[in-house]
Curated annotation (Swiss-Prot):
Entry keywords, A to Z: Carbohydrate metabolism, Cytoplasm, Fucose metabolism, Isomerase, Manganese, Metal-binding
Pathway: Carbohydrate degradation; L-fucose degradation; L-lactaldehyde and glycerone phosphate from L-fucose: step 1/3
Enzyme class label: isomerase
Main location: cytoplasm
Function, in words: Converts the aldose L-fucose into the corresponding ketose L-fuculose.
Location of the protein in the cell: Cytoplasm
Residues reported to bind Mn(2+): 335, 359, 525
Stated name of the protein: L-fucose isomerase
Protein family (similarity comment): Belongs to the L-fucose isomerase family.
Gene Ontology CC annotation, any one: cytoplasm
Protein EC: 5.3.1.25
Required cofactor(s): Mn(2+)
Length: 588
């Protein structure tokens, strides 16, 4: 059984015996325990289990104790460390020198002992040795016997832990390409060096004929297939067929297509993570899967010109339920856009929530909306908005039909209930695919995302000579008047899933206007997650050494390793590029 990645907690202490060290043992170890309790009681893994921490076997005052801690962490699948101390310690003697995992240090802000002095000293050693570390120092002085973690310290500890766990969860997993390059899209030109050096992941690939091989040879669970067919007939609403009359399939042909796309879902899932049932059926090799944390399906055009498209498969892999019940989502990219798949993966690992994959299709200015509909935009939509619409697939969680405190949300699977599942299904239909585009047919996913959800749109791009760069746009989904929505939606393909999105503007740079956001977006796709998580993404990007070229996160929320400030404090964007370029990828 594969262990969860863990956070290692390192209590460091003044090594002087005969009074000094002894007086600090309890306070120092209690700091470590309080950090471990905070993380384990607040954060969860994608499977819903509490995050696990490992505390060093003793306080760390000298090199042998640092080495013992390091050995324990190596055996315990520790993916990141947090060093805590209320006092002076010996900097380079007590630091963790592992170069390939993130590090953070919390120096207690108290006057009796110089925890802040150690923090500054050890961060200087980290900078000298080229091993980045995050510095955490509370804003307010605490009493020496105060065991509470201040709110500002909690925020940084949790932001660091979320991002660090994401690096550990990615490591030693795979991106699985089902097919190859789709329609010349750059993101589907999969770059194995990026995956290996920045994420610690490997790449695997199968030809799309693997789907037909498994169908023809019965390499799927026939009992599950029968159960799925019953469930689909009971719960899935087939939408209006908008095809030309000569392209409309017969009822019998559509029935066959439903059977086909259900098998596609089952095979796509089994390819990613395996299925023990296949071994029982005599297919031991196929039963193990590809250990894929994220995958993509090429589809267009070689597959979709002949076979039903992948929309149903993609939709339900990214959704948190199917005929087997509520479960965690998969991360699955349309058109094998690996870079948008990774963007979705970053979002997912930071939030444990399913992701919207969308084309960043259109900027609608207030003037254009008024000209076309006669409606004057107001509220969050007043400056215009973006039409986010994928070509036929999207997680059903993207409907916004789940709620928390009466408001629409996308939430982890362990919070989802059956009434919310039913609401998602009732507010979605599955029209036959547009056969002018998808000659082989299939079924698209059609819904409208509810408005007023805080969301973050993300995109990873590759820039020759630089490497990966990340873009982040926080904002809100919108709910337009029904007639306005229909007028605008019908100008595209109204059989596809739509999200209206207004990024939060700052009045400068790429966020001077909604038009500037669209104009500076680096690719045709974006990954959209529930919540404003831009600050967490910036922290994660710094751990992976990926510079952020565009974001609208308030400066006070930016949390990067301390040595980033040594690259400059006025122009943080340029300093980020220089730091990432000098340090290089995390796993190189």
């Amino acid at each position: 059984m594969i262990q969860h990645p863990r956070i290692g907690i390192r209590p460091t202490i003044d090594g002087r015996r005969q009074g000094v060290r002894e007086s600090l043992e309890v306070q120092t170890m209690n700091m470590a325990k309080s950090v471990a309790d905070l993380i384990s009681s607040t954060l969860k893994y994608p499977d819903g289990e509490p995050v696990e921490c490992v505390i060093s076997p003793s306080t760390i005052g000298r090199v042998p104790e640092a080495a013992a801690s390091h050995e324990l962490f190596k055996k315990s699948n520790v993916c990141a460390t947090i060093t805590v101390t209320p006092c002076w310690c010996y900097g380079s003697e007590t630091m963790d020198m592992s170069p390939d995992i993130p590090h953070a240090i919390w120096g207690f802000n108290g006057t009796e002992r110089p925890g802040a002095v150690y923090l500054a000293a050890v961060l200087a050693s980290h900078a000298q040795k080229g091993i980045p570390a995050f510095g955490i120092y509370g804003r307010d002085v605490q009493e020496a016997n105060d065991t509470d973690i201040p709110e500002d310290v909690k925020e940084k500890l949790l932001r660091y832990a979320r991002a660090a766990l994401a690096t550990g969860l990615m490591r030693d997993t795979a991106y699985l390409s089902m097919g190859s390059v789709s329609m010349g899209i750059g993101g589907s030109i999969v770059n194995p060096d990026f995956f290996q050096e920045y994420l610690g992941m490997r790449n695997e690939s199968v030809d799309m004929t693997e789907f037909t091989r498994r169908m023809d040879r019965g390499i799927y669970d026939p009992e599950e297939f029968e159960r799925a067919m019953v469930w689909v007939k009971e719960h899935i609403k087939e939408g209006v067929d908008r095809n030309r009359e000569d392209l409309i399939l017969s009822k019998e042909e559509k029935e066959k297509q439903w059977e086909f796309v259900i098998k596609m879902f089952m095979i796509g899932r089994d390819l990613m993570v395996g299925n023990p049932r296949l071994a029982e059926l005599g297919f031991e090799e196929e039963a193990v899967g590809h250990h894929a944390l994220v995958a993509g399906f090429q589809g267009q055009r070689q597959w979709t010109d002949h076979f039903p498209n992948g929309d149903f498969m993609e939709t339900f892999l990214n959704t948190q339920f199917d005929w087997n019940g509520i479960r965690k989502p998969f991360v699955f990219a349309t058109e094998n856009d690996s870079l948008n798949g990774v963007s979705m993966l970053f979002n997912y690992l930071l939030t444990n929530t399913p992701q919207i994959f969308a084309d960043v299709r259109t900027y609608w200015s207030p003037e254009a909306v008024e000209r076309v509909t006669g409606y004057t935009l107001e509220g969050r939509a007043a400056a215009g908005f973006l039409h986010l619409i994928n070509s036929g697939s999207c997680t059903l969680d993207g409907t916004g039909q789940a709620t928390r405190d009466g408001k629409p949300v996308m939430k982890p699977f362990w919070e989802l209930d059956e009434s919310e599942v039913q609401a998602m299904l009732e507010n979605t239909d599955f029209p036959p695919a547009n056969r002018e585009y998808f000659r082989g047919g299939g079924f698209s996913t059609r819904f409208l995302t509810k408005g007023d959800m805080p969301v973050t749109m993300v995109r990873l791009n590759l820039l020759k000579g630089v490497g990966p760069v990340l873009q982040i746009a926080e904002g809100y989904t919108l709910e337009l008047p029904e007639d306005v929505h229909h007028t605008l939606d019908n100008r595209t393909d109204s059989g596809w899933p739509t999200t209206w999105f207004a990024p939060r503007l700052t009045g400068k740079g790429a966020f001077k206007s909604v038009y500037d956001v669209m104009n500076n977006w680096g690719a045709n796709h974006g990954a959209i997650t529930y919540g404003h998580i831009g600050a967490d993404l910036i922290t994660l990007a710094s751990m992976l050494r990926i510079p952020v070229n565009m974001h609208n996160v308030p400066e006070e929320d930016i949390f990067r390793p301390k040595n980033w400030s040594l690259f400059g404090t006025e122009d943080l964007e340029s300093a980020d590029y220089r730091a990432c370029q000098l340090l290089g990828p995390l796993h190189k």
